[in-house]
Design a protein with these regions (language model features):
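Short, well-ordered alpha-helical segments
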Residues: 74-89, 169-193
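Surface-exposed short loop/turn segments
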Residues: 94-146
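Short, highly charged C-terminal tails/helix-capping segments
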Residues: 186-207
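Short secondary-structure boundary motifs at beta->alpha junctions and helix caps
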Residues: 68-69, 143-184
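N-terminal segment of the mature soluble domain
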Residues: 43-106
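Beta-strand elements of well-folded, non-transmembrane domains
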Residues: 87, 104-106, 130-140, 151-159, ...
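Bacterial Sec signal peptide processing site at the extreme N-terminus
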Residues: 14-39
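Sec-dependent bacterial lipoprotein signal peptides
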Residues: 1-21
Length: 207
C-alpha cells in the first residue's frame, strides 16, 4: 500500500504536466513552419536568351505601415524562386539577355476602427503588392522588349487575432498572390514576348 500511495501522486503529476501543452498556447518554436511557394512542377518558359538575370530593386523599410518583414514567407524571396522555376535561358549562342526585375514586394497594414466601444471589433487590413518586369535586351542591336505585371492582394482580419492565426492567413495570402501572378505573367510573356519564347504552347485546332 505504501508503494501505491507513492505512485498515485506521481501519476497525477505526470497527467497534469502532459496536459499543460494543450491548456497553454504554443510557443514560437512550436508554431508551424511555412515555405515560399514553388512552381518547379510546371514546364518552364524557355527563352531564346543566353542568360537570365534576377534583379531586386525592392528595399524593405522595416517600419510601419510596411510589415512584409513580419510575414513567415518573403514575397521578395518568393519572386526570386518563381523566376528560377519558370524562366529559363535556352539559347546559349544568343547575344540576348533576359532580366527579371522585382520592383515591389511589400506589404502594408492599416487599422480599421470598429464602431463598437464595448467590444473590440477593430480590424487590420493588409495589402500585398508584387510588381515584376521581364525585359529582354539584344546586345547586337541594343533593342529591348519587356512586359510587366502589377499584382496585389488584400486581407482583413480582427485586430486581436493571435500570431499563429495571423501567420496562417499571411501564408495563404502570399500563395494566392503568386498563383494569380503566375497566370498573369505567363500570359503576358506569351503575348508580348512571344518572338523570344522557344516552347510556345500549342493551341489545338478543331475541325
Amino acid at each position: 500500500m505504501i508503494k501505491l500511495k507513492n505512485i498515485l501522486p506521481l501519476a497525477i503529476l505526470g497527467f497534469f504536466i502532459s496536459g499543460c501543452s494543450t491548456l497553454f498556447p504554443q510557443t514560437e518554436e512550436e508554431l508551424p513552419k511555412y515555405t515560399e511557394p514553388r512552381y518547379n512542377t510546371e514546364e518552364p518558359i524557355q527563352l531564346s536568351v543566353n542568360k537570365v538575370n534576377i534583379i531586386s530593386e525592392f528595399t524593405p523599410t522595416f517600419t510601419r505601415p510596411h510589415v512584409e518583414h513580419l510575414f513567415p514567407v518573403s514575397i521578395e524571396k518568393s519572386a526570386k524562386l518563381w523566376a528560377q522555376d519558370r524562366i529559363k535561358a535556352a539559347d546559349y549562342s544568343s547575344r540576348k539577355v533576359a532580366e527579371v526585375v522585382i520592383k515591389d514586394a511589400g506589404v502594408t497594414e492599416e487599422i480599421e476602427k470598429g464602431d463598437n466601444q464595448i467590444f473590440n471589433n477593430d480590424r487590420i487590413r493588409y495589402r500585398a503588392n508584387l510588381v515584376i518586369t521581364i525585359r529582354i535586351t539584344d546586345l547586337d542591336n541594343m533593342s529591348q522588349a519587356s512586359t510587366n505585371v502589377e499584382a496585389w492582394r488584400e486581407l482583413a482580419i480582427p485586430a486581436d487575432t493571435d500570431i499563429a492565426e495571423k501567420e496562417q492567413y499571411w501564408n495563404g495570402m502570399v500563395n494566392k498572390l503568386f498563383d494569380e501572378f503566375n497566370i498573369k505573367m505567363s500570359d503576358n510573356i506569351y503575348k508580348n514576348l512571344n518572338m523570344y519564347v522557344i516552347n510556345k504552347p500549342i493551341t489545338p485546332t478543331y475541325y
